[in-house]
Swiss-Prot record:
Keywords: Chloroplast, Plastid, Ribonucleoprotein, Ribosomal protein. This is Large ribosomal subunit protein bL27c. GO terms for biological process: translation. Belongs to the bacterial ribosomal protein bL27 family. One of its GO terms (cellular component) is chloroplast. One of its GO terms (molecular function) is structural constituent of ribosome. It is found in: Plastid, Chloroplast.
Length: 74
């Protein structure tokens, strides 16, 4: 027998909706571990650092002072 015989399930992290794409209220934009992307306008953070839309609109990514922000613009 071997000591290496195990693996964890993938957590399906990453960007779910990309820039300039439409999103509905409550739609998930990014699943992440920690705040790699920070919430901008009309975006909120879930308890597992998931970013989701507070309003309907188009997703916009921007970098300000070396920080990545995600916003939802009408």
């Amino acid at each position: 027998s071997t000591k290496n015989g195990r693996d964890s399930n993938s957590k399906r992290l990453g960007v779910k909706v990309y820039g300039n794409q439409p999103i509905k209220k409550g739609g998930i934009i990014i699943r992440q571990r920690g705040l790699t992307f920070k919430p901008g306008i009309n975006v909120a953070v879930g308890k597992d650092y998931t970013l989701f839309a507070l309003q309907e609109g188009d997703v916009k990514f921007e970098t300000i002072a070396n920080r990545k922000f995600v916003s939802v613009i009408k």
